[in-house]
Amino acid sequence: TKEEKIKLSRYMFGKAVGDEDVENARLQPALVGQSAYWIAKQAGFEIPEDTSIICVPCKEVGPKEPISREKLSPVLAVFKVKDDKEGFQKAAEMVEFNGLGHSAAIHCKEQAMADAYGEKVKAMRIIWNSPSTFGGIGNVYNSFLPSLTLGCGSYGRNSIGGNVSAV
C-alpha cells in the first residue's frame, strides 16, 4: 500500500517521497543483510514471515524517490514500463544513479535483446539470465573471476573494470 511504502522508505532511508530534504536520504545500516520480514516489522507493518522479497512500485529514479537508491537488502524498486526501450532507459538511470559501471542484470531469451541492453546500460558486468547478486561475484553461475571486490571501470572512476582477485 502507499502507507506501507512511506513507512518502509522512512525506516530504510529516514525520508519518503515528498518529505522535506528527501534528496539527503541515507540508508539505515542496521537493515543491511536482514530478511524482508524483519525489515517490514521494523518499518511498522506485517508481511508473512516466509516472504523473500518486498517489491515496491516506484515512479521515478533519483534522489526524490528513496526506494530507487541502492538498498543492500531484499527490497526491490519496481517500475512499470511500456516496452523494452523504456525498460532499458530505467535500468540505465538506476545504474547511473546508484553505481555507474558496477553491474546490471537482464532476464530474456533473445541474444539481440541482451546485447541491446548491454549497449544501453553503463555497467562493466551485464549479467544475463543469472541471479544478479551472485552472478556478479562470479564462479557459480558464469565465468566471471570469483571476487567480492568488483571494479567499475572508467564509468565509476576505477582503474579496474573486472572482478578483483588474488587468483
Predicted regions and their residues:
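ALDH superfamily catalytic-core signature
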Residues: 1-62, 83-89
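Conserved C-terminal structural/oligomerization subdomain of aldehyde/semialdehyde dehydrogenase
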Residues: 45-167
